[in-house]
Amino acid sequence: RMLLEQLKVGHPKAKLLADKALAEMLILEEQFHKAVQLLQPIAASKPGDRGILRLLADTYYLMGDWSSLQKLLHDLNYYKAINPSNMKALELDVYANLLSDFIPDPEFTLQEQKDQAGELWELIPKRLRNDAELICGYFDALQQVNDTDRVQLLMVKTINKRWHPELVARFGQLVTSAPEKQLLAGEKWLSDHPEDPVLLVALG
């Protein structure tokens, strides 16, 4: 580490390389906060440096700092720091974790808590909102604020497109203002999946 510091002082042009190497060392040593302190100013001054963006993303990921990583997704995508298939997997991972970590603010009214869950869903790009895993996470967040009715139509559309047992199980937990629509959807699925154990439990 001392050699890296000396390199930065003696060879200013090598400073970026030395900082990247130092950040990698800090990450390996699990000194994540120090790595972030080192990387954030560099990312701010050199926003298009893909190596720095990847290191910062890795650090946030290892810290479980999903909120900071979510804010970094735009730059990771814009500067093509990660290949498209890995980028989509990372996005899904980040939003799934944000949803699973959702805790309504106890100081809020019930309506404010419902809005809090809705705002989290609005953070998710529209192109990802038909992902069954994310809808499961959204359902779980809405369940905490007694607002699962909001997601009924989205669940039906998603299950119609692709059968997803976890989503079907949650469909059975829906408390809805339109139970007849819920029953109609369930009966349609039953004709296509007459012996599906998850569906049979969901329909009671």
Predicted ranges, named:
Residues 1-204:
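Repeat-based scaffolding regions
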